UniProtKB/Swiss-Prot annotation:
Pathway, per record: Secondary metabolite biosynthesis
PANTHER family: EG:EG0003.4 PROTEIN-RELATED (PTHR48043), FI06409P-RELATED (PTHR48043:SF145)
Top-level taxon of origin: Eukaryota
Protein name, as recorded: UDP-glycosyltransferase 1
Membrane topology: Single-pass membrane protein
EC number of this enzyme: 2.4.1.-
Outcome when changing residue 62 to F: Reduces the catalytic activity and does not lead to the ability to perform C-glycosylation
Lineage: Eukaryota, Fungi, Dikarya, Ascomycota, Pezizomycotina
This protein's GO CC annotations: membrane
Transmembrane segments: 450-470
Family designation: Belongs to the glycosyltransferase 28 family.
Known uses: Phaeomoniecin D was found to show anti-HIV activity, antibacterial activity against methicillin-resistant Staphylococcus aureus (MRSA), alpha-glucosidase inhibitory activity, as well as significant protein tyrosine phosphatase 1B (PTP1B) inhibitory activity and thus is a promising candidate for drug discovery projects.
Its job: Acts as a depside 2-O-glucosyltransferase that catalyzes the first glycosylation step during phaeomoniecin D biosynthesis by producing the intermediate exophillic acid which is further O-galactosylated into phaeomoniecin D by the C-galactosyltransferase OGT2.
Subcellular location: Membrane
Length: 482
C-alpha cells in the first residue's frame, strides 16, 4: 500500500484512499547495507556450514530492527489503541508482544506454511527447507533420514543466533517468546493446497492464496509489438533484489538461451535486466543482444507478460509472488532459486509438474538448453500448468475469505472479553477458531492419561488372573499328588 521513493517506502499509493495515516516505526535500510546483505544471500549455500554463518549475519541484521520496532510500536499503540493488528512474518515478534501486552486481536501473514506450526509426520525434515523431498511418499528411508539430519544441522548452526535473540529481548525487558506447535492467533498463508503439499491444519491456520490484485499494469507498446511478432517467448525475471548482470551465472544463462533459440525451442526472449554496477561493468560488459530475438528492459509489467499467449516459459528465481503469478496465468517455470524460500518453491514446481529447477552453484549452459527444450516440447508441462492455473484461479478467491476471517476474529474478540476496568480483563470464552487441544497439555490432548488408565486396568486384570490361575493350579496339583 506504500509507494517507493527516494526516502523509502513512505508514500501512500493513491488507489488505497481508505488509509488515512502511515506511521513509520523503524528506520529504512541503507542502500549499501541492502546491497551487502543481498550479496551475501546471492552467494550463500544453505548446505554449506561456512555459508550458514553469513545467513546468520543476515538474519541477525534483520531481527535487530525489533528493538526499534518494539519501542515505537509500543508508543504508538499506547496512544492510538488500534482495534486489530495485522502483521507480517518479519514483524511477528513485535506484533505478538503488542498483542500480549495490550490484549489486541491479531493476524499474521506468512508466505508459505510456517515450519513450526501444525507439523505432519509424513513431511520429513524441516518444512520449507527440504533438500529433495517435500513428503515421505516417494522418499526412501535414507532420504527421509537425510532430511532429518539436514534439519538438525541447520538448527544447530543457528544456535548462537537463538541465544543472541534471547539476550536482545532480555536486555529490552521483553517477555520470553513462547514456542507452540499450534497457532494461538489467526495465521493467513499466501499459498494454496495443490501447489503446497496438503496436510491437516488447525482452524487458525488458513491458506488464502494466491493473493493477487484484480488489476495489473498493461503491456507497453514496445512489449506488445515484440510479443505479437513472436510465438514462443521466454520471459526472464529475477525479482527486485537479485542482479545477475555479469559473472558466470549470467554467461551460462545467456549461452544456454542462445542455444535454445538456435534449436528452435524459443523464438524470442523478454529479459528484465538491471543495468550492471559501475564497478563491474568494465570487466563484465553485457553482450550485444540481437533485437530480433531479445527485448531487454529494466522493468516489465510481469503479469501482463505472463498473460500474453506468446509467453510459453518463465525463467525465474522462484520468488513467492512470481510463482503465484505464473501459476495463475498457467506459464511453466524454469527455476533458478537463489536464497530462502525460493528453494522450497523450486521443489514445489517440480512436484506438481509445472516446472524444472537448476542448482545455482553448478548449473551449466547445456542444462539450460536441455531443460528449455524439454519444457517447450513435452506436453505434460503445458497440461499440468493448465491444471494448476484452474486451481490457482479458484483459490485466488480466498483473499475475500481472509478479510472475512479478520472480521470474525475482531468480532469474536470483542464478545469474548468483559472489561470492567483497565486492570480487570476476564476471558468469557476461548477463541472461536482455537481447538481445545491448543489449551491442553500434550498428555491430556493425546488421551495418554486414558491410555495409562487402560494399561493399568488391563495390567491389573492380567496380574489378578495370573495370580488366581497360578493359585488354582498349585491347589489342584497338591490334591493330585496326594
Amino acid at each position: 500500500m506504500l509507494n517507493k521513493d527516494a526516502n523509502g517506502f513512505q508514500d501512500l499509493d493513491p488507489q488505497y484512499s481508505f488509509i488515512s495515516k502511515v506511521h513509520i516505526i523503524a528506520s529504512k535500510i541503507k542502500p549499501e547495507d541492502d546491497e551487502k546483505l543481498h550479496s551475501i544471500l546471492d552467494e550463500s549455500d544453505i548446505r554449506d556450514w561456512e555459508s550458514r554463518k553469513g545467513l546468520a549475519k543476515v538474519l541477525q541484521f534483520m531481527e535487530r530492527s525489533w528493538i526499534e520496532t518494539h519501542k515505537n510500536l509500543r508508543a504508538l499503540i499506547s496512544k492510538e489503541r488500534p482495534d486489530f493488528i495485522f502483521g507480517d512474518l518479519l514483524d511477528q515478534q513485535a506484533c505478538v508482544d503488542m498483542r500480549n501486552e495490550f490484549n489486541i486481536p491479531m493476524a499474521i501473514h506468512f508466505g508459505q506454511m510456517p515450519f513450526h506450526l501444525a507439523p505432519a509426520k509424513y513431511i520429513p525434515g524441516l518444512p520449507g527447507f527440504q533438500q529433495r523431498y517435500l513428503t515421505s511418499e516417494h522418499a526412501s528411508i535414507w532420504g527421509r533420514i537425510s532430511e532429518d539430519f539436514f534439519a538438525l544441522g541447520l538448527v544447530f548452526s543457528l544456535r548462537h543466533h537463538f541465544r543472541w535473540r534471547k539476550q536482545m529481548r532480555d536486555q529490552a525487558g521483553a517477555a520470553p517468546l513462547a514456542f507452540s506447535r499450534k497457532p494461538d492467533s489467526l495465521i493467513l498463508v499466501n499459498t494454496f493446497f495443490g501447489f503446497e503439499p496438503p496436510k491437516e491444519l488447525p482452524p487458525l491456520l488458513v491458506p488464502v492464496g494466491p493473493i493477487l490484485s484484480d488489476n495489473y499494469s498493461p503491456l507497453t507498446p514496445e512489449l506488445e509489438s515484440f510479443l505479437s511478432t513472436h510465438k514462443n517467448v521466454l520471459y526472464i525475471a529475477f525479482g527486485s533484489h537479485i542482479n545477475l548482470t555479469g559473472g558466470s551465472r549470467f554467461t551460462k544463462l545467456f549461452d544456454g538461451i542462445n542455444s535454445a533459440i538456435q534449436s528452435g525451442f524459443i523464438d524470442g526472449v523478454v529479459w528484465t535486466l538491471k543495468p550492471p554496477k559501475t564497478s563491474s561493468s568494465s570487466s563484465n560488459p553485457l553482450p550485444n543482444f540481437d533485437p530480433k530475438f531479445y527485448h531487454i528492459t529494466p522493468f516489465a509489467p510481469q503479469r501482463a507478460i505472463l498473460a500474453h499467449p506468446s509467453t510459453t516459459l518463465f525463467l525465474s528465481h522462484c520468488g513467492a509472488s512470481s510463482i503465484n503469478e505464473a501459476l495463475f496465468h498457467g506459464v511453466p517455470i524454469l527455476g533458478l532459486p537463489i536464497y530462502n524460500d525460493q528453494f522450497k518453491y523450486a521443489l514445489c514446481i517440480e512436484n506438481v509438474g509445472v516446472g524444472l529447477k537448476m542448482d545455482k552453484t553448478d548449473f551449466e549452459a547445456k542444462e539450460v538448453h536441455q531443460k528449455i527444450g524439454r519444457m517447450t516440447t513435452e506436453p505434460s508441462f503445458q497440461q499440468d500448468s493448465k491444471r494448476m492455473m484452474g486451481i490457482a484461479r479458484i483459490a485466488a478467491r480466498r483473499k475475500h475469505l481472509a478479510a472475512d476471517l479478520i472480521e470474525e476474529e475482531l468480532l469474536d474478540h470483542e464478545g469474548r472479553f468483559s472489561l470492567s476496568s483497565k486492570s480487570d480483563v476476564r476471558h468469557r470464552r476461548p477463541p472461536h477458531l482455537q481447538t481445545a487441544s491448543a489449551r491442553m497439555s500434550w498428555f491430556r490432548a493425546g488421551n495418554y492419561d486414558i491410555y495409562l488408565v487402560y494399561a493399568l486396568v488391563l495390567g491389573s486384570a492380567w496380574w489378578i488372573g495370573k495370580t488366581i490361575l497360578g493359585t488354582g493350579i498349585k491347589l489342584a496339583m497338591g490334591k493330585w499328588l496326594r
